[in-house]
Regions:
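Catalytic-pocket segment enriched in acidic/His residues
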Residues: 129-149, 154-157, 168
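HotDog/MaoC-like acyl-thioester-processing domains
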Residues: 1-12, 19-97, 155-157, 164-207
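Generic alpha-helix signal with a bias toward terminal, lower-confidence helices
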Residues: 112, 137, 161-163, 167
């Protein structure tokens, strides 16, 4: 199964979670091609913690002999959600433009059966998973890989941003050298003129 479809399977399971309409993703971690099986991962969706402001969810699905995992932290923003202004973007960032259209969003919401009202109507925001999927599609990491995303500010549908690819630093080089299972570590920021929308770290592993 193509890994984009594997992501959608994991994300669609989250849509079955009750009482989280209007909530937002604070952070998530995908792990595709994980062969280490735990008894606790037999259940497709586990609620590790949930109260009125925060929920931690563990999701598991299978692609043949490989296991895919998704750990998500959701937050209830209440009335505190703020969006950046719509100022023009810096022209020098055009090589890495990032924008999610209304059509893309509607198609994604249908695929995962997401009815969260924050993705509908005027001022609707892009689903966090959809941003993650677009970034992963652009990078095309090889399975097995792990991808961590931390969402800092909502991005409105049809608003442009850009991807900033951080060069490999000494810390990453030492990490790869120390852990022989690692093949590549890539860090990315999604930005607008006013905000950092998300921070991502994608780690590829040797098979």
């Amino acid at each position: 199964m193509e890994y984009t479809k594997r992501l959608l399977v994991l994300e669609g399971l989250l849509s079955t979670l009750p009482d989280c309409q209007g909530w937002m993703i604070a952070k998530c971690r995908f792990s595709l091609g994980n062969r280490k099986m735990k008894t606790s991962d037999q259940l497709p969706l586990q609620i590790l913690k949930k109260d009125g402001r925060l929920a931690k969810i563990h999701i598991c699905s299978f692609a043949g002999e490989e296991k895919d995992l998704l750990d998500v932290t959701l937050i209830n923003p209440g009335q505190r959600m703020t969006l950046g202004s719509r100022e023009n973007m810096e022209t020098e960032k055009e090589d890495h433009l990032f924008k999610v259209t209304r059509e893309e969003t509607d198609r994604y919401l249908r695929e995962v059966k997401d009815q969260n009202p924050i993705h509908q109507g005027e001022g609707a925001i892009v689903p966090g998973f959809l941003m993650a999927n677009k970034i992963l599609k652009q990078l095309s990491p090889q399975i097995p890989f792990q991808a961590e995303f931390r969402f800092l500010t909502p991005l409105q549908i049809e608003r442009s941003g850009w991807l900033e690819f951080l060069s490999s630093d000494e810390e990453n080089d030492l990490k790869i050298e120390a852990e022989k299972a690692l093949k590549k570590v890539q860090k990315i920021h999604l930005k607008t003129p006013q905000n950092i929308i998300l921070k991502a770290e994608i780690t590829e592993y040797k098979e």
